[in-house]
Amino acid sequence: MALEYPPHLRYVDTHEYIRVEDDIAVIGITAYAVDQLGDIVFVGLPEEGTEIEKGESFGSVESVKAVEDLYAPVSGKVVAVNKAVVDSPESIADDPYGDGWLIKVRMTNPEDLDDTMSAEAYASLVEGS
């Protein structure tokens, strides 16, 4: 089954995606990351109000295969945390780009998005073409 990378999202090479809603960045992990991790058993996320910095770890995802850090694609303040995925981490795999989002961040520097990739560029990265 081919993995999907919706064209309206932005991507980073650490396998997070960004859905931009005005000055809010909705951040999650890509279908590629979900596929590589396998069964996700734990998600550690920051609390609302936490300041995160672009390029720095803001949490982790644990699967039966590995524990991977989550890296912030943008800087800002966490304004929402998806408690549903904290309570049921395996649900991320069902809809990584929809209900499986991780955090929402009010961006302090929207120019951070300049360093993100299109769906096409991200697909080329992960598919090695």
Swiss-Prot record:
<comment type="similarity">
    <text>Belongs to the GcvH family.</text>
</comment>
<feature type="modified residue" description="N6-lipoyllysine">
    <location>
        <position position="65"/>
    </location>
</feature>
<feature type="domain" description="Lipoyl-binding">
    <location>
        <begin position="24"/>
        <end position="106"/>
    </location>
</feature>
<dbReference type="InterPro" id="IPR017453">
    <property type="entry name" value="GCV_H_sub"/>
</dbReference>
<dbReference type="GO" id="GO:0005829">
    <property type="term" value="C:cytosol"/>
</dbReference>
<keyword id="KW-0450">Lipoyl</keyword>
<dbReference type="InterPro" id="IPR003016">
    <property type="entry name" value="2-oxoA_DH_lipoyl-BS"/>
</dbReference>
<dbReference type="InterPro" id="IPR033753">
    <property type="entry name" value="GCV_H/Fam206"/>
</dbReference>
<protein>
    <recommendedName>
        <fullName>Glycine cleavage system H protein</fullName>
    </recommendedName>
</protein>
<dbReference type="GO" id="GO:0005960">
    <property type="term" value="C:glycine cleavage complex"/>
</dbReference>
<dbReference type="InterPro" id="IPR011053">
    <property type="entry name" value="Single_hybrid_motif"/>
</dbReference>
<dbReference type="InterPro" id="IPR000089">
    <property type="entry name" value="Biotin_lipoyl"/>
</dbReference>
<comment type="subunit">
    <text>The glycine cleavage system is composed of four proteins: P, T, L and H.</text>
</comment>
<dbReference type="Pfam" id="PF01597">
    <property type="entry name" value="GCV_H"/>
</dbReference>
<dbReference type="InterPro" id="IPR002930">
    <property type="entry name" value="GCV_H"/>
</dbReference>
<comment type="function">
    <text>The glycine cleavage system catalyzes the degradation of glycine. The H protein shuttles the methylamine group of glycine from the P protein to the T protein.</text>
</comment>
<dbReference type="GO" id="GO:0019464">
    <property type="term" value="P:glycine decarboxylation via glycine cleavage system"/>
</dbReference>
